Amino acid sequence: MRLMLYNMRYGTGTGFKFHLPFPFGGFFRKTGKNLDALVRFFREQKADVLGLVEIDSGSYRSSHRNQANYIAWKLGQHPFCRSKYGHRSWWGRLPLMRKQANACLCGQPVLNQRSHFLRKGVKRLVMELELQEVVIFIVHLA
C-alpha cells in the first residue's frame, strides 16, 4: 500500500510570493491556478491513500468548491473531509476558518470513517479511516 500525506496550504502557493504584499498575504489568494497542477502531481505519485491537510472545503478562495471532492473526482477516489475545528471552537464560527479542513482520499473500499477531536490545541481533528487490512489516522498538529 502506498500512503502519501501532503500539506496543501489551501492550494494558495508557496515561496517568497506567498508573503507579498504583506506577510502570509498568500493565505487569502484564490487557488484555481494551483489546484490542477497539484492534481497532476498526485496522479504521478499513484498513492492508494492520500492524506491532505490544510485544504479549502468551499470558501471564496476555492470559488466555493471543496478541494477534496474535486481532487478525488479527478483521481477516481473517494473523499473523507472534515473541518479542522470542533463544533465548540470559536475558530469554526469564522467564515474563512470554518472552511479549513483536512481530508483523506482513498481508492480502496472504506469500511469505517470517524472523526475525533483532541482535548487541547487549536487544530484538534484526528481523522480515522478503517480499510480492509489497516486503520489510518490523519492528524495535523499545530
For each predicted feature, which ranges?
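Structured beta-strand-rich core segments of catalytic domains in phosphoester-bond hydrolases
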Residues: E54-A142
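N-terminal, active-site-proximal structural segment of metallo-dependent hydrolase catalytic domains
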Residues: M1-Q77, C81-W91
